[in-house]
């Protein structure tokens, strides 16, 4: 069986980081290619949705499997305060692997999230329960989603799950959010509604440079920090703001 793992949403200031994993029969990659599977960034939203729906219709008894692991902004912020984003992704890739229904005779290809692809593999596998799995091997490659259809499929699953999370957030706050990436004009505009003097929305990555810069330019006082209780003055300000609204 072939397994692909990839992520979506490492760089955005809004929403989760999502890791996708999929498993297909050894001879299925030509079929994936024929269905238009390629790096999710090169596909329209409509095409990604069509491919995702098709994938989930494939017979699980033949080994087809796919799922995602979502890492919320709070967890991302705490990771930035600790070991960093690379280790967070290592943990996420491990978690994704543990969802696989079969753990033998697998060739696993991951899109490397570390400048050292071999190190990325080693960090993942050293924490995977029971590794090495019988008859299995794992490699990590840079731009694997461009060269391995099974990894491209994983990227599509991850991207679609992240898009759903962003849509849910947009509906909750009542504004358009764009892609969530700092360079997106719609995302930039949305920050005015998400980063308030009284607090920052939980689906914003508080530790991102974009947030720090916005706070410095448009808000006063110290930037809130995840896990640090706000001051009495901030709490009173929030209460006053609530009464005004």
Which stretches of residues belong to each language-model region?
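RNase H-like, Mg2+-dependent phosphodiesterase core
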Residues: 1-245
């Amino acid at each position: 069986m072939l397994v692909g793992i990839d992520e979506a949403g490492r760089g955005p200031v809004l929403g989760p980081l999502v890791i996708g994993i999929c498993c297909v029969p050894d001879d299925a990659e030509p079929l994936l290619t024929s269905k238009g599977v390629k790096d999710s960034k090169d596909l329209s939203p409509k095409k990604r949705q069509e491919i995702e729906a098709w994938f989930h219709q494939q017979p699980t008894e033949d080994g087809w499997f796919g799922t995602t692991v979502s890492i919320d902004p709070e967890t991302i912020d705490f990771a930035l305060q600790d070991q960093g984003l690379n280790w967070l992704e290592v943990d996420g890739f491990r978690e994704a692997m543990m969802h696989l229904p079969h753990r033998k005779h697998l060739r696993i290809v991951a899109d490397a999230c570390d400048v050292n692809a071999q190190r990325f593999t080693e960090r993942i596998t050293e924490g995977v329960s029971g590794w090495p799995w019988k008859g299995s091997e794992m490699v990590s490659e840079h731009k694997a989603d461009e060269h391995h259809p099974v990894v491209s499929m994983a990227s599509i699953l991850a991207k679609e799950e992240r898009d759903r999370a962003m849509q849910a957030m947009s509906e909750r706050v009542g504004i358009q959010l764009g892609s969530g990436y700092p360079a997106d004009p719609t995302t930039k505009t949305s920050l005015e509604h998400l980063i308030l003097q009284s607090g920052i929305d939980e689906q914003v990555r508080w530790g991102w440079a974009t947030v720090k810069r916005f706070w410095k330019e448009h808000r006063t006082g110290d930037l809130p920090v995840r896990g640090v209780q706000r001051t009495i003055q901030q709490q009173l300000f929030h209460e006053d703001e609530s009464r005004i609204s």
